[in-house]
Amino acid sequence: LQETVVLDDDTETMVSLVGKRQVPILVKDDGQAMLESMDMVRHIESIGAPVLTGPERPEIAAWENATAPKAAPLTQPRYPLLGLPEFGTVAALDHYTIRKRKTLGDLVELRARTRELLRELTPRLEELDRLIECPQAVSGALSVDDVRVLPVLRSAAVVKGLRFPDKVRRYYETMMDRLGYQPLPAV
């Protein structure tokens, strides 16, 4: 697989591939574009020997669905500060800031409310701490559950002052190391 970064203001590329402004997009070898993340995961799993063989637990999907809205006001205002490639031009960075201001509010004000917003996210992380079965895989063996949880944690880890509960921290560190990912900076 080859990764290509689409600048945040490059709506034309997104629309030409999938008919709307959305990422990530997976373009398969036959040229067909896929838009839904879990469809992409299942497609990639079908290419070789399956890796995500563990159980899918409904409580993990429920955790993700309940946690993502709590994390967004903390994480998304920080993305412009991280030097991410999708904000590689002033126009792309401005585009993101304007878009997020419309949906979340003022990004500087949201960053100033970090302590308050962390109080809302912390119970979700404590719940995950109770759900994690082992540091190597949230449900005991690698599964789609890990694909649901790890991106939320990787995003949340950009929040300076956030402390993961013990099992969450061990899981996050183990998975990042296992995948060879460097954590994003905390700001």
Indicate where each model-derived feature is located:
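GST-like fold's C-terminal all-alpha helical module
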Residues: 69-173
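GST-like domain detector, emphasizing the conserved glutathione-binding G-site
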Residues: 1-95
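Short, hydrophobic secondary-structure boundary micro-motifs
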Residues: 52-54, 137-141, 184-186
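Short, mixed-charge aromatic SLiMs
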Residues: 67, 170-186
